[in-house]
Amino acid sequence: MTRRYWNINLEEMMEAGVHFGHGTRKWNPKMAPYISAKRKGIHITNLTRTARFLSEACDLVFDAASRGKQFLIVGTKNKAADSVEWAAIRARCHYVNKKWLGGMLTNWSTTETRLHKFRDLRMEQKTGRLNRLPKRDAAMLKRQLSRLQTYLGGIKYMTGVPDIVIIVDQHEEYTALRECITLGIPTICLTDTNCDPDLADISIPANDDAISSIRLILNKLVFAICEGRSSYIRNP
């Protein structure tokens, strides 16, 4: 895999608060190699290490995108949801930003059935068929459609399990991460000072609570994916 330059700037990361970790009492000792200091009761992440692993992650997603691979971005907590949707739409990736339904990947046949139902209901709504049903039936199906849109709207075009999964918060998305591990799907994970860096294929030491930090990391990954997709289009 060729290494590239991704314009990862330490000062920019500091301004975004990427280096701020959790309180020193809430930490995972496995993160010790990625922590540079303690300040006012919180751990400070070593941004040189962050830059290194973020660059590796960008190389990985560029290479995968240049070969037409598919990505899933997962981040369901309120601080991450908007950034996840924005990043996924920009890079034409699938995403989950409301709630991870258990078995979404490991029980793909069930997810696929739900997606077929979702597409059918969307088509019925688009063609006006729902409005021609009895009011009670129409209301029930519209509620079902709304629920499916909330939980599956970001993966409505997904036809199989993704090739790479990007996870914003390891603790919040632990179920998703375990499913990826079970299926052998490579993962890239924002890893705060209370996380286990060994669980992901590439762990990016970073603040996973600040919107500015989440957005900066996703922005770099999205740029690399878009560059890779452009390469794939030019050289199919």
Swiss-Prot record:
InterPro entries documented for this protein: Ribosomal_uS2, Ribosomal_uS2_bac/mit/plastid, Ribosomal_uS2_CS, Ribosomal_uS2_flav_dom_sf
Biological process according to GO: translation
GO molecular function: structural constituent of ribosome
Organism superkingdom: Eukaryota
PROSITE patterns in alphabetical order: RIBOSOMAL_S2_1, RIBOSOMAL_S2_2
SUPFAM superfamilies assigned to the protein according to its UniProt record, in alphabetical order: Ribosomal protein S2 (SSF52313)
Keyword Membrane in annotation: no
UniProt keyword terms in alphabetical order: Chloroplast, Plastid, Ribonucleoprotein, Ribosomal protein
Keyword Plastid: yes
Pfam family for this entry, one: Ribosomal_S2
Compartment(s) where it occurs, according to its Swiss-Prot or TrEMBL record: Plastid, Chloroplast
GO cellular component entries: chloroplast; small ribosomal subunit
Family per record: Belongs to the universal ribosomal protein uS2 family.
PANTHER family noted in UniProt: 30S RIBOSOMAL PROTEIN S2 PROKARYOTIC AND ORGANELLAR, SMALL RIBOSOMAL SUBUNIT PROTEIN US2M
Protein name: Small ribosomal subunit protein uS2c
